Protein backbone atom coordinates (compact mmCIF):
# COMPACT_ATOMS: atom_id res chain seq x y z
CA UNK A 1 0.00 0.00 0.00
CA UNK A 2 2.83 2.39 0.84
CA UNK A 3 4.48 1.70 -2.50
CA UNK A 4 1.23 2.24 -4.39
CA UNK A 5 0.66 5.54 -2.61
CA UNK A 6 4.14 6.73 -3.55
CA UNK A 7 5.65 6.46 -0.07
CA UNK A 8 8.86 4.73 -1.14
CA UNK A 9 10.53 5.21 2.24
CA UNK A 10 7.74 3.39 4.07
CA UNK A 11 7.67 0.67 1.44
CA UNK A 12 11.43 0.27 1.76
CA UNK A 13 11.19 -0.23 5.52
CA UNK A 14 8.44 -2.80 4.99
CA UNK A 15 10.45 -4.72 2.40
CA UNK A 16 13.53 -4.61 4.62
CA UNK A 17 11.56 -6.05 7.52
CA UNK A 18 10.26 -8.84 5.29
CA UNK A 19 13.78 -9.60 4.07
CA UNK A 20 14.88 -10.10 7.69
CA UNK A 21 12.35 -12.89 8.24
CA UNK A 22 13.48 -16.51 8.41
CA UNK A 23 10.57 -17.86 6.36
CA UNK A 24 11.98 -18.24 2.79
CA UNK A 25 8.94 -17.03 0.87
CA UNK A 26 8.52 -13.92 3.01
CA UNK A 27 12.23 -13.19 2.84
CA UNK A 28 12.19 -13.58 -0.94
CA UNK A 29 9.27 -11.17 -1.33
CA UNK A 30 11.11 -8.63 0.79
CA UNK A 31 14.30 -9.00 -1.24
CA UNK A 32 12.32 -8.73 -4.47
CA UNK A 33 10.70 -5.51 -3.29
CA UNK A 34 14.04 -4.03 -2.25
CA UNK A 35 15.55 -5.13 -5.56
CA UNK A 36 12.79 -3.44 -7.53
CA UNK A 37 13.31 -0.21 -5.60
CA UNK A 38 17.09 -0.29 -6.03
CA UNK A 39 16.76 -0.80 -9.78
CA UNK A 40 14.17 1.95 -10.07
CA UNK A 41 16.48 4.35 -8.24
CA UNK A 42 19.51 3.35 -10.34
CA UNK A 43 21.46 1.79 -7.48
CA UNK A 44 22.99 -1.01 -9.54
CA UNK A 45 25.57 -2.28 -7.05
CA UNK A 46 22.92 -2.58 -4.34
CA UNK A 47 20.53 -4.20 -6.81
CA UNK A 48 23.21 -6.71 -7.81
CA UNK A 49 23.77 -7.80 -4.22
CA UNK A 50 20.02 -8.16 -3.65
CA UNK A 51 19.64 -10.15 -6.87
CA UNK A 52 22.36 -12.54 -5.70
CA UNK A 53 20.52 -13.11 -2.43
CA UNK A 54 17.20 -13.58 -4.24
CA UNK A 55 18.72 -16.10 -6.65
CA UNK A 56 20.12 -18.11 -3.75
CA UNK A 57 16.61 -18.36 -2.32
CA UNK A 58 14.91 -19.04 -5.68
CA UNK A 59 17.56 -20.46 -8.02
CA UNK A 60 14.93 -21.99 -10.31
CA UNK A 61 12.98 -18.78 -10.91
CA UNK A 62 13.60 -17.55 -14.46
CA UNK A 63 13.01 -13.87 -13.76
CA UNK A 64 15.43 -13.84 -10.84
CA UNK A 65 18.19 -15.49 -12.86
CA UNK A 66 17.66 -13.15 -15.81
CA UNK A 67 17.63 -10.07 -13.56
CA UNK A 68 20.85 -11.21 -11.90
CA UNK A 69 22.50 -11.74 -15.29
CA UNK A 70 21.37 -8.33 -16.58
CA UNK A 71 22.79 -6.60 -13.52
CA UNK A 72 26.07 -8.49 -13.77
CA UNK A 73 26.34 -7.35 -17.39
CA UNK A 74 25.56 -3.73 -16.55
CA UNK A 75 28.15 -3.67 -13.77
CA UNK A 76 30.78 -5.47 -15.86
CA UNK A 77 30.88 -8.47 -13.52
CA UNK A 78 31.80 -10.84 -16.36
CA UNK A 79 33.18 -13.76 -14.35
CA UNK A 80 30.03 -14.05 -12.25
CA UNK A 81 27.87 -13.43 -15.33
CA UNK A 82 29.39 -16.49 -17.00
CA UNK A 83 28.75 -18.57 -13.90
CA UNK A 84 25.13 -17.40 -13.92
CA UNK A 85 24.84 -18.50 -17.56
CA UNK A 86 26.23 -21.95 -16.74
CA UNK A 87 23.73 -22.34 -13.89
CA UNK A 88 20.90 -21.14 -16.14
CA UNK A 89 21.76 -23.79 -18.74
CA UNK A 90 21.99 -26.49 -16.07
CA UNK A 91 18.59 -25.46 -14.69
CA UNK A 92 17.20 -25.38 -18.26
CA UNK A 93 16.30 -21.68 -18.04
CA UNK A 94 18.05 -21.25 -21.38
CA UNK A 95 19.15 -23.73 -24.04
CA UNK A 96 22.68 -25.03 -24.43
CA UNK A 97 23.27 -23.12 -27.68
CA UNK A 98 22.00 -19.87 -26.17
CA UNK A 99 24.28 -20.44 -23.20
CA UNK A 100 27.31 -20.92 -25.44
CA UNK A 101 26.46 -17.76 -27.34
CA UNK A 102 26.21 -15.74 -24.12
CA UNK A 103 29.49 -17.12 -22.88
CA UNK A 104 31.11 -16.30 -26.24
CA UNK A 105 29.94 -12.70 -26.02
CA UNK A 106 31.26 -12.48 -22.46
CA UNK A 107 34.62 -13.87 -23.61
CA UNK A 108 34.69 -11.27 -26.41
CA UNK A 109 34.16 -8.47 -23.88
CA UNK A 110 36.84 -9.91 -21.60
CA UNK A 111 39.22 -9.96 -24.58
CA UNK A 112 38.55 -6.29 -25.28
CA UNK A 113 39.14 -5.32 -21.66
CA UNK A 114 42.31 -7.40 -21.40
CA UNK A 115 43.74 -5.78 -24.53
CA UNK A 116 42.93 -2.28 -23.25
CA UNK A 117 44.78 -3.12 -20.02
CA UNK A 118 47.84 -4.42 -21.89
CA UNK A 119 47.23 -8.08 -21.02
CA UNK A 120 47.80 -9.34 -24.55
CA UNK A 121 48.00 -13.08 -23.79
CA UNK A 122 44.72 -12.91 -21.87
CA UNK A 123 43.12 -10.97 -24.72
CA UNK A 124 44.19 -13.64 -27.19
CA UNK A 125 42.98 -16.45 -24.94
CA UNK A 126 39.55 -14.92 -24.40
CA UNK A 127 39.15 -14.29 -28.14
CA UNK A 128 40.04 -17.90 -28.90
CA UNK A 129 37.49 -19.11 -26.35
CA UNK A 130 34.81 -16.89 -27.91
CA UNK A 131 35.44 -18.44 -31.34
CA UNK A 132 35.42 -21.96 -29.92
CA UNK A 133 32.11 -21.35 -28.15
CA UNK A 134 30.43 -19.71 -31.16
CA UNK A 135 32.21 -20.53 -34.45
CA UNK A 136 29.72 -18.41 -36.46
CA UNK A 137 30.30 -15.33 -34.27
CA UNK A 138 31.85 -12.99 -36.84
CA UNK A 139 33.11 -10.24 -34.48
CA UNK A 140 34.92 -12.85 -32.38
CA UNK A 141 36.56 -14.36 -35.47
CA UNK A 142 37.83 -11.00 -36.72
CA UNK A 143 39.09 -10.04 -33.25
CA UNK A 144 40.89 -13.36 -32.81
CA UNK A 145 42.45 -13.11 -36.27
CA UNK A 146 43.67 -9.55 -35.67
CA UNK A 147 45.21 -10.53 -32.33
CA UNK A 148 46.90 -13.56 -33.89
CA UNK A 149 48.33 -11.34 -36.62
CA UNK A 150 49.65 -8.94 -33.99
CA UNK A 151 51.34 -11.92 -32.33
CA UNK A 152 53.06 -12.82 -35.60
CA UNK A 153 50.81 -15.81 -36.27
CA UNK A 154 49.54 -14.71 -39.65
CA UNK A 155 48.97 -18.21 -41.07
CA UNK A 156 46.77 -19.18 -38.13
CA UNK A 157 44.91 -15.87 -38.45
CA UNK A 158 44.16 -16.61 -42.11
CA UNK A 159 42.81 -20.03 -41.12
CA UNK A 160 40.47 -18.45 -38.56
CA UNK A 161 38.96 -16.17 -41.20
CA UNK A 162 38.65 -19.01 -43.72
CA UNK A 163 36.92 -21.26 -41.19
CA UNK A 164 34.47 -18.48 -40.33
CA UNK A 165 33.80 -17.83 -44.04
CA UNK A 166 32.69 -21.43 -44.48
CA UNK A 167 29.99 -20.90 -41.87
CA UNK A 168 28.93 -17.29 -42.46
CA UNK A 169 30.51 -15.08 -45.14
CA UNK A 170 30.53 -11.46 -44.01
CA UNK A 171 32.09 -8.21 -45.30
CA UNK A 172 33.98 -7.76 -42.03
CA UNK A 173 35.64 -11.14 -42.56
CA UNK A 174 36.67 -10.01 -46.04
CA UNK A 175 38.07 -6.80 -44.55
CA UNK A 176 40.03 -8.84 -42.01
CA UNK A 177 41.49 -10.94 -44.82
CA UNK A 178 42.53 -7.75 -46.62
CA UNK A 179 44.40 -6.66 -43.50
CA UNK A 180 46.17 -10.02 -43.43
CA UNK A 181 47.18 -9.90 -47.09
CA UNK A 182 50.80 -8.89 -47.55
CA UNK A 183 51.73 -7.08 -50.74
CA UNK A 184 49.70 -5.19 -53.30
CA UNK A 185 46.41 -5.49 -55.15
CA UNK A 186 47.30 -8.74 -56.92
CA UNK A 187 48.17 -10.41 -53.62
CA UNK A 188 44.87 -9.27 -52.13
CA UNK A 189 43.02 -10.65 -55.14
CA UNK A 190 44.71 -14.03 -54.73
CA UNK A 191 43.80 -14.03 -51.02
CA UNK A 192 40.16 -13.27 -51.85
CA UNK A 193 40.08 -15.99 -54.49
CA UNK A 194 41.21 -18.49 -51.88
CA UNK A 195 38.72 -17.17 -49.31
CA UNK A 196 35.79 -17.15 -51.75
CA UNK A 197 36.57 -20.73 -52.68
CA UNK A 198 35.32 -21.84 -49.27
CA UNK A 199 31.80 -20.57 -50.05
CA UNK A 200 31.91 -20.04 -53.79
CA UNK A 201 28.27 -19.23 -54.58
CA UNK A 202 27.59 -16.86 -51.69
CA UNK A 203 26.83 -13.22 -52.52
CA UNK A 204 29.58 -12.00 -50.20
CA UNK A 205 32.12 -14.15 -52.06
CA UNK A 206 31.23 -12.49 -55.36
CA UNK A 207 31.34 -9.02 -53.79
CA UNK A 208 34.70 -9.66 -52.11
CA UNK A 209 36.14 -10.89 -55.41
CA UNK A 210 34.68 -7.93 -57.30
CA UNK A 211 36.21 -5.44 -54.85
CA UNK A 212 39.61 -7.11 -55.06
CA UNK A 213 39.43 -7.31 -58.86
CA UNK A 214 38.55 -3.62 -59.08
CA UNK A 215 41.55 -2.77 -56.91
CA UNK A 216 43.77 -4.85 -59.20
CA UNK A 217 42.14 -3.30 -62.29
CA UNK A 218 40.96 -6.70 -63.45
CA UNK A 219 37.86 -5.19 -65.01
CA UNK A 220 36.42 -8.27 -66.72
CA UNK A 221 36.71 -10.33 -63.53
CA UNK A 222 35.06 -7.58 -61.51
CA UNK A 223 32.20 -7.32 -64.00
CA UNK A 224 31.72 -11.08 -64.02
CA UNK A 225 31.12 -11.17 -60.28
CA UNK A 226 29.10 -7.96 -60.11
CA UNK A 227 26.78 -9.12 -62.89
CA UNK A 228 25.93 -12.15 -60.77
CA UNK A 229 24.90 -10.12 -57.70
CA UNK A 230 23.52 -6.98 -59.40
CA UNK A 231 20.38 -8.59 -60.83
CA UNK A 232 17.28 -6.41 -61.02
CA UNK A 233 17.49 -4.99 -57.48
CA UNK A 234 21.14 -4.39 -56.54
CA UNK A 235 21.97 -3.18 -53.07
CA UNK A 236 23.51 0.24 -52.58
CA UNK A 237 26.94 -1.36 -52.09
CA UNK A 238 26.76 -3.30 -55.36
CA UNK A 239 25.52 -0.24 -57.26
CA UNK A 240 28.48 1.79 -55.98
CA UNK A 241 30.88 -0.94 -57.12
CA UNK A 242 29.24 -0.94 -60.55
CA UNK A 243 29.75 2.83 -60.72
CA UNK A 244 33.42 2.36 -59.87
CA UNK A 245 33.73 -0.31 -62.56
CA UNK A 246 32.16 1.83 -65.30
CA UNK A 247 34.44 4.73 -64.44
CA UNK A 248 37.58 2.61 -64.09
CA UNK A 249 37.20 0.32 -67.08
CA UNK A 250 35.61 2.64 -69.65
CA UNK A 251 35.84 6.14 -68.14
CA UNK A 252 32.08 6.15 -68.77
CA UNK A 253 31.03 9.04 -66.56
CA UNK A 254 27.38 8.88 -67.57
CA UNK A 255 27.04 5.15 -66.81
CA UNK A 256 28.88 5.67 -63.53
CA UNK A 257 26.55 8.52 -62.59
CA UNK A 258 23.50 6.38 -63.38
CA UNK A 259 24.75 3.66 -61.06
CA UNK A 260 25.35 6.20 -58.31
CA UNK A 261 21.76 7.37 -58.73
CA UNK A 262 20.61 3.77 -58.35
CA UNK A 263 22.80 3.44 -55.26
CA UNK A 264 20.97 6.36 -53.67
CA UNK A 265 17.59 4.61 -54.00
CA UNK A 266 18.71 0.97 -53.66
CA UNK A 267 18.25 -1.26 -50.65
CA UNK A 268 20.44 0.15 -47.85
CA UNK A 269 23.63 -1.63 -46.92
CA UNK A 270 23.43 -3.92 -43.92
CA UNK A 271 24.67 -2.64 -40.57
CA UNK A 272 24.76 -3.69 -36.93
CA UNK A 273 21.30 -2.78 -35.64
CA UNK A 274 20.01 -3.32 -32.10
CA UNK A 275 16.91 -5.49 -32.30
CA UNK A 276 15.67 -3.94 -29.06
CA UNK A 277 15.86 -0.18 -29.71
CA UNK A 278 17.06 0.25 -33.31
CA UNK A 279 20.44 1.78 -32.46
CA UNK A 280 22.91 1.50 -35.36
CA UNK A 281 26.68 1.11 -34.90
CA UNK A 282 29.58 0.61 -37.30
CA UNK A 283 31.26 -2.02 -35.11
CA UNK A 284 29.48 -4.77 -33.18
CA UNK A 285 29.27 -4.27 -29.41
CA UNK A 286 28.38 -6.78 -26.65
CA UNK A 287 26.01 -4.31 -24.97
CA UNK A 288 23.89 -1.70 -26.72
CA UNK A 289 25.06 1.76 -25.75
CA UNK A 290 21.51 3.11 -25.96
CA UNK A 291 19.23 0.57 -24.28
CA UNK A 292 21.98 -1.35 -22.42
CA UNK A 293 20.61 -4.71 -23.60
CA UNK A 294 23.02 -7.62 -23.95
CA UNK A 295 23.86 -9.15 -27.35
CA UNK A 296 21.10 -7.46 -29.34
CA UNK A 297 23.00 -6.31 -32.44
CA UNK A 298 22.02 -8.08 -35.65
CA UNK A 299 23.55 -7.66 -39.10
CA UNK A 300 20.68 -6.48 -41.30
CA UNK A 301 19.70 -3.70 -43.71
CA UNK A 302 18.13 -0.66 -42.03
CA UNK A 303 14.54 0.06 -43.10
CA UNK A 304 13.82 2.13 -46.17
CA UNK A 305 12.54 5.68 -45.69
CA UNK A 306 9.12 4.58 -46.93
CA UNK A 307 9.03 1.87 -44.26
CA UNK A 308 9.92 4.43 -41.61
CA UNK A 309 7.13 6.71 -42.83
CA UNK A 310 4.61 3.88 -42.62
CA UNK A 311 5.68 3.05 -39.07
CA UNK A 312 5.56 6.71 -38.03
CA UNK A 313 2.05 7.02 -39.51
CA UNK A 314 1.02 3.99 -37.47
CA UNK A 315 2.43 5.64 -34.36
CA UNK A 316 0.38 8.79 -34.99
CA UNK A 317 -2.81 6.80 -35.59
CA UNK A 318 -2.43 4.26 -32.80
CA UNK A 319 -0.04 5.84 -30.32
CA UNK A 320 2.50 3.02 -30.52
CA UNK A 321 5.92 3.80 -29.05
CA UNK A 322 8.61 2.50 -31.41
CA UNK A 323 11.57 4.16 -29.68
CA UNK A 324 13.38 5.82 -32.62
CA UNK A 325 17.11 6.24 -32.50
CA UNK A 326 18.68 9.31 -34.05
CA UNK A 327 22.29 8.76 -35.11
CA UNK A 328 23.82 11.77 -36.83
CA UNK A 329 21.35 12.98 -39.43
CA UNK A 330 19.46 9.71 -39.90
CA UNK A 331 16.62 8.27 -37.85
CA UNK A 332 16.62 4.50 -37.50
CA UNK A 333 13.56 2.46 -36.62
CA UNK A 334 13.73 -1.27 -36.13
CA UNK A 335 12.48 -3.46 -38.97
CA UNK A 336 11.10 -6.93 -38.29
CA UNK A 337 13.86 -9.31 -37.21
CA UNK A 338 15.36 -11.01 -40.25
CA UNK A 339 18.28 -12.95 -38.84
CA UNK A 340 21.22 -13.00 -36.42
Annotate the PLM regions.
Residues 1-286, 290, 297-340:
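Repeat-based scaffolding regions
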Amino acid sequence: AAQLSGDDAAAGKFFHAMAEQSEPETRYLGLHGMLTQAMHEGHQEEALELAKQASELKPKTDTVVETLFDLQVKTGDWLDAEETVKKAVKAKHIGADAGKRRRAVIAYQQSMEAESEGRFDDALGHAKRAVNLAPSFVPAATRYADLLADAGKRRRAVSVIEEAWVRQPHPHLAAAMERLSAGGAEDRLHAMERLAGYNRDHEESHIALARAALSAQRWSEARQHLDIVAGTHPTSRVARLMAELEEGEKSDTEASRNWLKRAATAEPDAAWICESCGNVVAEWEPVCGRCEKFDTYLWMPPPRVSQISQVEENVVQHGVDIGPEIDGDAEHVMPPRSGA
